[in-house]
A protein has these predicted regions:
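Short alpha-helical basic/polar micro-motif
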Residues: 52, 65, 115, 162, ...
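C-terminal accessory/binding modules appended to enzymatic or scaffolding proteins
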Residues: 243-291
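Basic, amphipathic alpha-helix used for nucleic-acid engagement in HTH/winged-helix/SANT-Myb modules
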Residues: 234-235
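Glycine- and acidic
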Residues: 49-54, 102, 253, 271-273, ...
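Active-site cores that bind ATP or allylic diphosphates and position pyrophosphate for catalysis
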Residues: 1-83, 88-95, 103, 261
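Catalytic adenosine-cofactor/nucleotide-binding cores of aminoacyl-tRNA synthetases and other
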Residues: 74-231, 240, 295-329
Length: 329
């Protein structure tokens, strides 16, 4: 091991790196039991396996000069080094399974799509160049075709779970209705036990608003059974609804719903919009109270008439009557 001067090696990400030879330790190659140490075995194994590119975390940059001394001692070609900066949980902490950060398997179990995870992770610490620089969505085949080492960043990347959720939602929207249903069906069946409910219709309703599959139970649990809810939900600033006009709206909507012969989203919407026009109120004055009455939730996977069409006439009317009773107390 040289003790004077410097040693320089090239890394594809960090460029030329120079270290003081006096900082290199005289490494042990064989342990007392005759077995090789990791650094020694690693170099020999990589050479015998024909490894041309060594890709690893930037924390191992300091080990490269020690490896190079072994390559040179054996007369072997030094591989191309590609040291990648770590993926961070935040500005100060690296991602770590010990601290509860998710693995790939965890993300898939939560309902993320493989395609979305691959796309997002590929762009952590790497960015495409040229005509591809402005794009965010890539297939695995496209990534393999356009990948170039020069796009790897020296700066650590932060894993943003909210960005991944957004990207996953975009991939969900792109699925065909059949493909989405095949993924959502097991989750929907675990929550919705009423055989009268058309699960394909539920899937079609939630797909445009689904970020990850594990969100679905909370989104659709009201379908099987109306949850206990506070009448505060009827008060909505944007819709300009109050407890008083919500009661009036439900009371006015009830006979319209009872008299409706065609129970579809379109027929329901037309009838209720006509009612709003007759009462000379905004559509939301009728539709928001109805939405709350049939779902018991502030956020739903669809609008009032979509939910009514899904629940069916009998169940929808029963829930409207329950809403009227709550508002009359």
């Amino acid at each position: 091991i040289p003790h004077e001067g410097t040693t320089t090696f090239h890394d594809a990400s960090f460029g030329d790196i120079t270290v003081e030879n006096k900082e290199l330790e005289d490494q042990v190659l064989l342990k007392s039991d005759g077995l090789p140490t990791y650094n020694f075995a690693n170099v020999v194994d990589d050479h015998l396996m024909g490894i041309t590119h060594v890709v690893r975390g930037s924390e191992y940059l300091s080990s490269a000069p020690k490896y190079n001394l072994l390559y040179e001692a054996f007369g072997w070609e030094i591989p191309t080094y590609v040291h990648c900066s770590p993926v961070m949980r935040d500005a100060q902490h690296k991602m770590s399974k010990r601290h509860g950060d998710p693995s790939y398997e965890d993300l898939i179990r939560e309902g993320y799509l493989t395609e979305a995870v691959l796309n997002y992770v590929a762009l952590l610490g790497w960015s495409p160049k040229g005509e591809y620089a402005e794009r965010e969505f890539y297939t695995l085949c496209e990534l393999a075709e356009i990948f170039d080492i020069s796009g790897i960043s020296k700066s650590p990347a932060v894993f943003d779970i909210n960005k991944l959720r957004w990207m996953n939602a975009e991939y969900m929207k792109k699925l065909s209705p059949e493909a989405f249903f095949s993924k959502a069906e097991p989750v929907l069946k675990s929550v919705i036990t009423n055989p009268a409910i058309d699960l394909k219709a539920v899937a079609a309703l939630v797909q445009p608003r689904c970020e990850i599959l594990s969100d679905l139970p909370e989104r659709v649990d009201f379908i099987d059974k109306l949850p206990v809810y506070s009448t505060d939900l009827y008060v909505h600033k944007k819709s300009k609804t109050t407890l008083e006009n919500s009661l009036s709206s439900l009371q006015a909507a009830l006979p319209v719903l009872e008299g409706l012969e065609t129970w579809t989203n379109e027929a329901l919407y037309d009838a209720l919009v006509a009612l709003a026009a007759k009462l000379e109120v905004k559509n939301s004055i009728i539709l928001w109270p109805l939405r709350v009455a049939v779902s018991g939730k502030a956020s739903t996977p669809g609008g009032a008439t979509e939910l009514c069409a899904l629940l069916g006439k009998e169940e929808s009317i029963a829930r409207v009557k329950t809403g009227i009773e709550l508002l009359q107390k």
